[in-house]
Amino acid sequence: MMESLLQTLLNGAATGGVYALVALGYTLIFSVLGVINFAQGALFSLGGYATYLLMGGRIGVNGAWPGLGLPVALPFTLALLVAALVTALASLLVERLAFAPLRRRGAEPLQSLITSLGAGVVLVNLLQILMGAEGYAFPAGAEALAGLPDMLILAGARIRTIQVLLLAICAGAVVLLSLWLERSRSGKALRAVAEDFTTARLLGIDSDAMVRLAFALSGVLAGLGGGLVGLSVSLTGPYFGISYGLKGLAVLVLGGLGSVPGAIAGGLLMGLAEALVPADASGWREALAFAILFAVLLLRPGGLLGRIQPDKV
Amino acid sequence: MIDNGLLVQMLLGALLGLSVYLPLAAGQLSLATPAFYAIGGTLAALLSTRWALLGGGADGSLPLPSLLLELLLAALLTGVLAALVGGLVLRLRGIYLAIATIALVEIVRVAILNLPFTGGAVGIFGIPQPFADASGYLLPVLGLLILAGWLCQRLEALPLGQAMAAVRDDELAAECLGIDTTQVKLSAFVLSAVLAGSTGVLAAHFLNTWNARQGTFDVSVATLAFVILGGSRTWLGPVFGGMLLTALPELLRPVGDARLVLFGLVILLGPVLAPQGLITPALLERLGSLGRGAGR
């Protein structure tokens, strides 16, 4: 009993770590531009499929070119990093197509919710046409991670190495990001732009470059998340990232829009809450995040660690 | 090329477009239309297959008054639900409405999939038919569309419609003018929900089967594309967009697989290339003066 509870909690924390990555991706862009990038979930999918293909995975029977694959077979860690680079570039493309033209025109921020949703829908459906709707497991041997065993024994419980690794990588990414935001020169510049777009520009900070930086970083987070989920759970069709993206929105509201610690705490809480849903109600698990979202809106609209910012005139 | 069945689908698309248009006319991005559409359809499917009082015959027929009763009940249910959800969300900034309505669509989808009486993944089938064939549906669907269009047209002259336009153009300014902006946004949201719910009732009978796939995130995207293509400055925009984008994938078969790519491109590029959509008030004015010129 103890053993299974520990496993459940660790599973929940691992999923929660991924939710935190998604929510942080939203938070980076929200704090700079005050809008949500609805394409985040699709970038997450792209990260998973890019990792799969870079590891030597082939397109399945329902894809556009069955049996075709990249002429490379990278080890998982390397594939994950290259995939994160791919999603960073894709995220920059999303900024270029869905955000930059509207920002230049001074359009309503609401408009970029619509355009980024469009970018995400195009991306995920192109993936669907290319790869088919079928599920993919990562190539055999992927689990043999740098000589680590498949299972670890922790306090008498058998735990999948990948879960621990996933949590460690999420934690590492979060810590690095926070340190960078707090300490580095460009991190400070990014926070200055987040505080006040125009003033930062007057102070000589290249605001547009900072916006691109925020998109590239959130793309990296999406790529890491997608690749890690692909390895630990498998890819369940191109829409798997959308599902993480939607739950990331609930996490965002739970933690408080624009709050970095809120995104992390909200992600972990959400992952644990889902893991504790009993097996005979598992069909309802998908709705739990959104039920929590409404509860938060009812009880504490600013989120756990956020505050509602009044609109500026 | 366009048979009666497709024409009914196009009109249903126009109705869903109007449902997305109404909150947008008050500057609010709501993606909840599929949730209320799914609730309306599920209600109709449940009532007409389970409730003997409605008189669903063994031959699969349904008396017309029963259809009207379903419409009334669906409008009531979705209206109350929208008032509850909207009351929770609409005092916050616009982004919260977009997020909360996505959440609502997911909750309703999971509920329809998991509730013990909605038929699970298969759904409810053999829904009784109030009309003998597709052409019979033209009249009620067109009737609902005319009613909704008339309402939208009337709104432009009524205080509520003018307040909606004021909130869309500048919410803070509208508030300073003494407009109860939350109330205005809520009214638009409830109207949108009632329209989507009623459309769901007609769609459930027309389609003959109903399941959780009728109200998904994809439908949010499709219905949003209707409005972005047609334009949200006049109610004719979403009607045009809904009819065109419903017909297009059916008429161009090869597009079938890629229809969501098409919808995605519309909402990615639309706000950049044609911020007002294809049907703008200026265009209507030009058409109007052309018509007068020809008549003279």
Protein language model regions, located:
Chain B
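Transmembrane alpha-helices and adjacent helix-loop boundaries
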Residues: 1-296
